[in-house]
Each structure stands twice: as C-alpha cells, then as structure tokens.
Amino acid sequence: SDEGEGLWRRFPHLQLDGNLYPTHGLGPVANCLDINRGDRFEYLVSMSSLEAGLTEYRDEHVAPSDPKRQERYRTGDMNTSLIKTALGRTIMLQHDVVSPRPYSRINLISGTRGTFADYPPRIMLEGQPEGDAWAGLDAYKSEFESPLWTRVGELARKLGGHGGMDFIMNYRMVQCLREGLETLWHRRIGGA
C-alpha cells in the first residue's frame, strides 16, 4: 500500500536489515532485569534469516506493471539478537512481522525458581501446586498487582489501546512529570 501503515512498514524493509522494532520485546524485559538501574547491556550479536516472505507476498499480490515489483527487500524474515548484561544475564530478542503465525510477544523471563511467559501470560514456580505445568496469574494478582494498575486499570482498559498499555504508559509519564520523578526517558538521555 502507498497509504497509512503500508509506507512506514515497507520503507525500512527496503533500506535496513536487523530488528526494526526492538522496543516492544526489549522494554518489558529490560525493566524486569533492572537495566540502567543496577545492570546494563554489555554485548550484543544480531543476525537475520534470508528475506523471502515479503518478496513472495509482493509477487502474489502486486500487479506486474506496478513499480513496487522492482523493489528489493533487505530485512530478513526473522531477526534474532542475543544480548549479554554486565551481571551475566542473557536476553534473546526476536523480530518477525512477515511469517504467518498467531500474535505473540514471546516474552519469557526464566530464573532459578521459576519462569514467566507472556502472551498469553502464564507462570511456573518451583513448588507450585500445578507441578511442572503452566499456571495462570490470577492466584498472584492480589499479592503482586501494580498499585498503578489497581488505581487506573479500569480507566486504562476503557480509554487506552493495546489492552490499556498505551494509557498506562502515558499516565505514568504525566505522573512523573507532575511529581518531578525520573522517567525511563530521562534515564535514557542522562537526565534533563
């Protein structure tokens, strides 16, 4: 498409190879690992598969006379980045907007006493009644629910996109600015 999402998604695929959109996958994991609050990224290696999916889609859906048929995509269908932190933790970050598959954020946090996976959210903790099977989060929400979500979660679900995530992020930014608190954005640029 030459309008809307078609342009901003297509042009980077023509010019770049790598993870074109790392924030959704890396942001939540970096927050859980206290990146820039006790740990930091130290080493990264990244590689992409070959590009095939967009070319195949274009060849099946774009008229032979359309100038877009001459475009050559550079971004591989799947990019995988491995990141090592100063404390020895590892992160695997993947980006794939081409392959046919159900939506998943593929977030997984694994430690010595359990594992959390997201989308759909599920958890397995050492010694839990379910044994070595995934369990839902409902049993843990009352004890570990974010005070911010408790306060504005219903409003966020009603007014915000992505299940309330967009609203919560904007609400938290405004709260930090009003109260003079440090935001993640300030941390990234070294203060304001």
Q: Can you annotate each of these PLM segments?
A:
Residues A30, P100-A192:
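C-terminal helical cap and adjacent loop that interface with cofactors, partners, or active-site loops
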Residues S1-R72, M173:
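Predominantly a Rossmann-like dinucleotide-binding segment in NAD(P)-dependent oxidoreductases
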Residues T75, L93-Y103:
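Glycine-rich phosphate/pyrophosphate-binding beta-alpha loops
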Residues L14-P22, R37, R72-R74, L159-D166, ...:
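Aromatic-acidic/polar surface patches that form glycan- and anion
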Residues L33, T85, H95-V97, L177:
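Short beta-strand segments enriched in hydrophobic/aromatic residues
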